[in-house]
Amino acid sequence: MVHGPPPDRRWGQWVRLALGPASALGLARFAYGLLVPAMRTELHWSLAQAGTLTTANSLGYLLGAVAAAPVARLLGVAVTFRLGMVLTAAALAVNAATGRGYAALLVIRLVAGLAGALVFITAGVIASRAAARARSAAPLTICFAGAGLGIAISGTVLPPLLGHHPGRWPLGWGVLAAAAGLATIISWTAAEGGRERGTAGAVIHLRSVALLWPVALAYLLFATGYVAYITFLSAYLADHHAGVGQVALTWALLGLAAVAAPALWSRPISAWRGARALAALLAGLSAASALALVTTAPAAVAGSAIGYGVTFLGVPAAITALNRAAVAPRDWTGTLAAFTVVFAAGQTAGPYLAGALADRYGTGATLAWTAALCGAGAVISAAIRPPASASLGQD
């Protein structure tokens, strides 16, 4: 009889693995929103220019998602995870040293997105294998909660650091790089469950996207909309003269809510029929974004951040569950790959479009953008009928 590691050791491994999403998403992607006000002021950017850096990061994520399978086949899942962690920390460090060169910043944000995709995808593979061995969803829940941890840490540290000193933005990137480097060291052995090489890459099933077009459209609207809120939230608060304490508390609450989200939504996503969970998540996102538009009173902004944090990471999980229910098992991976392309396309276009809109109508337009697109996605999702069977991929 083969025995796995002791329970305490397994939990320790799962927590350390969660530092992958914490670094790849929380630090390297979403924390940029905290730096936008300082960089915009110091570098005299338009909001469209600020949004384009998120667009570059999202494009890098798409490239990384495409590259993850062949790289994992070549190097192994564990090595790919570690490589992604090192590249993520390095990209953040180079961000700190680049200076004012806009083109260089775009390239580095693209590299950070690519590295982040390698980390997030391989962490998911390792966590999935751990979940199968443990016969528990805990490894997956803990792993994906890591993104919220990275957001909470960033939100606690960066606002006091930058404060009324926008010229410190390179130091902000340096702090994120140091945190990502520490996460790399701590998580290094957490990839032990991913030594084996990956299996053959999946064929992207565009046919499934066509047959599941209402789900794909809702996902596209979410991807195009959600990213505007977290990219421009700090800029919106700065324009409304929010204090450092309010900004820090807002981001900390958003991150902690995101940590709790996987455990909160796992049962509804698996138990509710059809797209009810997806509709509820998107409706919650829309309402949370709109709340901060009504008033910038601290209580309302805090409620908005909590509502956003507790919903936005649940949408990809709900999409995954819908796809698994609608297509044959042999087509799961290819269908999810196709939906990843849909998601990446939306979140690549969204930040620039929302930023350009905000340049004309003010930073509040970015929150309205999120509320409108996610609200439209909720309406579409509410009309989706439950699949009769997992038959799309069958002859």
Where are these regions (language model features)?
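Structural signature of the two symmetry-related core transmembrane helices
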Residues: 79-93, 276-291, 371
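C-terminal transmembrane helical hairpin of 12-TM major facilitator-type secondary transporters
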Residues: 275-319
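Helix-to-loop junctions at the C-terminal end of transmembrane segments
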Residues: 64-77, 261-273, 358-359
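Conserved MFS/SLC helix-loop-helix module at the cytosolic interface between two early adjacent transmembrane helices
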Residues: 63-99
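A late C-terminal transmembrane helix in Major Facilitator Superfamily
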Residues: 327-363, 367-370
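Cytoplasmic helix-loop-helix junction between adjacent transmembrane helices
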Residues: 108-147
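Extracytoplasmic gate region of multi-pass secondary transporters
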Residues: 32-33, 211-252, 259
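Helix-loop-helix hairpin linking two adjacent transmembrane segments in secondary transporters
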Residues: 101-104, 133-192
